[in-house]
C-alpha cells in the first residue's frame, strides 16, 4: 500500500487543481475568527492562537 502518498496523488492534487476550500481547513474552520475573539478577550495577547507562525497554512 502507498497510504498517504496515494491519497495525495489521487485526491489532494485534483482538489488543489480545482481550488477546493477544505484543503486549507484552518481557513474554513473559523480559526481566524476564534483567534480574534481570544485576542479581544485577553487584551490582544494569547498563547492559544490557532493561526500564526508555525501553522501548516502559513
Curated annotation (Swiss-Prot):
Keywords: Glyoxylate bypass, Glyoxysome, Lyase, Peroxisome, Tricarboxylic acid cycle. It is an enzyme of class 4 (lyase). Pathway: Carbohydrate metabolism; glyoxylate cycle; (S)-malate from isocitrate: step 1/2. Gene3D superfamilies: Phosphoenolpyruvate-binding domains. One of its GO terms (cellular component) is glyoxysome. SUPFAM superfamilies: Phosphoenolpyruvate/pyruvate domain. Its cofactor is Mg(2+). It is found in: Glyoxysome. InterPro entries: Isocitrate_lyase, Pyrv/PenolPyrv_kinase-like_dom, Pyrv_kinase-like_dom_sf. The keyword Lyase applies. GO terms for biological process: glyoxylate cycle; tricarboxylic acid cycle. This is Isocitrate lyase.
